[in-house]
Amino acid sequence: MAKVESFTLDHTKVKAPYVRLITVEEGAKGDKISNYDLRLVQPNENAIPTAGLHTIEHLLAGLLRDRLDGVIDCSPFGCRTGFHLITWGEHSTTEVAKALKSSLEEIAYKTKWEDVQGTTIESCGNYRDHSLFSAKEWSKKILDEGISDKPFERHVVD
């Protein structure tokens, strides 16, 4: 079986919340795709409940696209501690951390239920499992801790 980088990361050494560049892959025509680890809570110490994580996912899908060029996808980790962000091209971890911070600020302090995309039976595969309240509370907690652009030391972005 192929080795997966995320499973070789020593989860006891990272200091969440942070943004980490996992890899940059280059296609046959030279196009680059980057994969980032957006770690919102400390692994094996906490996990975001599914309803809040699900709502954060739906909101980040739009908010990160508003802030970063080339966003392909933002998908939650099964462990519920953060997200993979996949983009065309390369962004610095500082740029991604600032976009994430700004997005979480919007979730925490401005977002209303009407702003959450994909919350109907037609538009979501598990539309009943959402909580804007939880998304807001977790966003505030993450923002209070500060988002670092380095995974192994705290270097909080402004």
UniProtKB/Swiss-Prot annotation:
Catalytic activity: S-(5-deoxy-D-ribos-5-yl)-L-homocysteine = (S)-4,5-dihydroxypentane-2,3-dione + L-homocysteine
Cofactor info, note text: Binds 1 Fe cation per subunit.
Cofactor(s) needed: Fe cation
Group of enzyme by EC: lyase
Gene3D superfamilies in alphabetical order: S-ribosylhomocysteinase (LuxS)
GO BP field: quorum sensing
Entry GO MF terms: iron ion binding; S-ribosylhomocysteine lyase activity
Domain of life: Bacteria
Keywords attached to this entry: Autoinducer synthesis, Iron, Lyase, Metal-binding, Quorum sensing
Binding site for Fe cation: H54, H58, C124
EC code(s) of this entry: 4.4.1.21
Homology family: Belongs to the LuxS family.
Subunit description: Homodimer.
Function: Involved in the synthesis of autoinducer 2 (AI-2) which is secreted by bacteria and is used to communicate both the cell density and the metabolic potential of the environment. The regulation of gene expression in response to changes in cell density is called quorum sensing. Catalyzes the transformation of S-ribosylhomocysteine (RHC) to homocysteine (HC) and 4,5-dihydroxy-2,3-pentadione (DPD).
NCBIfam families named among the record's database cross-references: PRK02260.2-4 (NF002606), PRK02260.3-1 (NF002608)
Protein name: S-ribosylhomocysteine lyase
Gene name per UniProt: luxS
